[in-house]
Amino acid sequence: MLNYTSFTHSRSNSIQRLFLLLSLVFVTTISSAQRAVIPLNNDWLFRFSHEVHKGSGHKVALPHTWNAVDALSGKPDYKRGIGNYSRSLFVPASWQGRRIFIRFEGANTTTDLFLNGKHIGEHRGGYGAFIFELTDKLIYGAKNQLLVRVNNAEQLDVMPLVGDFNFYGGIYRNVALLLTNDVCISPLDYASPGIYLRQTKVDAQQADVKADVMLDNPTDKTQQVEVAVEVFSGDKSIIKQQKSIRLEAQAMVKKHTIPFTIRRPHLWNGTQDPFIYKV
């Protein structure tokens, strides 16, 4: 079950907004597409790249920055360079058959991920989430070695170049493993929840909303899946909308839209009536 929030544009001549909280229950014809999120913030060993001697690193927990002290001096000479985060990761044999991702909520400024000594991928930019799929690269039933190399040195092709703030280096937000079934709501669309809400019309009479759901089918077979949306006002279910979808083989990050309408919606007013819908 996934939650995603969004809000509408303003009503004409009004600051009232409709604030929707939706959750989509996604079930394939094979098995339930539940996902597991496993925090990966602890047991990291950190060292700078110039610290090459054995035992030179020290344990840290995420979120972490190597500029926690020097960047507060008010001077522009705080450390900007490469930091390395490493840890072991035991992957149970029972995880075979699932898709496994590692998701970073943020690391500054560029990040390279290595698994068991092999380069998995790079992310450039310090202010957005990113994700890598590890499914076919893990050793199951054994310990795997993760290395995350983060660089906050100035790089002319990575924005911003200047600012009235410090470019704190490190993995400064949470990291987690994500386990899904083969057919799932895709986490690969810029590391988003894979669900986007678009309000196309909102007034006192009705709110027209479209839920765009990004779906993955990495298998070699066409899959028939069902996507369901249920909207609640308080504890009362007011909308149940579902759609049967045929996913072609090897279809990745494919958008499917489920429209629904809320009649006479309870409009959101942040200062006087902060009502929300939920699923």
Task: Tell what function each PLM region has.
Residues M1-S12, Q16-L21, V25, S31-V279:
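Secreted/periplasmic carbohydrate-active enzymes, especially glycoside hydrolases
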